[in-house]
């Protein structure tokens, strides 16, 4: 299962604005062999931010690409999950390069133009 951001043309589709550093492509990759792709999940930009913040609340500091993978895997499992199904995801980046973007308070709302709620486990009681 491939996971990509909305606005990326990696797997076709309309190009669009992407604000999370490192997500998607503006040009279709020449090395991509789509015969290996069984399914495609496209993730909206607020979702990886929320996934990263949820993981950070549990002690894991991952980057925007990993947040996209985790979000996409969760979407795929929600649609296709069944008892005993196991998913494996690749975490391609860590979060230290995203401290001024994904993890900075107010950044998603200002740049992505979408409200990203704080994950429940990170909210004060």
Which residues are covered by each model-predicted region?
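Nucleotide donor/acceptor-binding cores
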Residues: 84-86
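Short glycine/serine/threonine-rich phosphate/pyrophosphate-binding segments
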Residues: 65-73, 98
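A short, charged, Gly/Pro-tolerant segment at domain boundaries
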Residues: 88-98, 104-105
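Short glycine-rich anion-binding loops that position phosphate/pyrophosphate groups of nucleotides
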Residues: 8, 67, 93-95
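A short, acidic, amphipathic alpha-helical segment used as a generic capping/interface helix at domain edges
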Residues: 48, 70-79
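Active-site/ligand-binding loops adjacent to catalytic centers
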Residues: 1-64, 80, 102-125
């Amino acid at each position: 299962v491939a996971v990509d951001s909305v606005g990326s043309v990696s797997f076709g589709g309309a190009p669009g604005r992407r604000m999370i550093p490192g997500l998607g492509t503006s040009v279709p990759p020449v090395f991509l062999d789509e015969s290996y792709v069984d399914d495609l999940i496209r993730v909206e930009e607020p979702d990886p931010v929320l996934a990263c913040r949820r993981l950070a609340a549990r002690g894991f500091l991952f980057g925007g690409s990993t947040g996209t993978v985790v979000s996409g895997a969760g979407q795929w499992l929600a649609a296709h999950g069944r008892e005993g199904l196991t998913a494996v995801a690749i975490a391609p980046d860590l979060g230290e390069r995203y401290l001024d973007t994904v993890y900075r308070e107010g950044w998603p709302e200002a740049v992505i133009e979408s409200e990203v709620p704080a994950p429940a486990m990170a909210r004060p009681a």
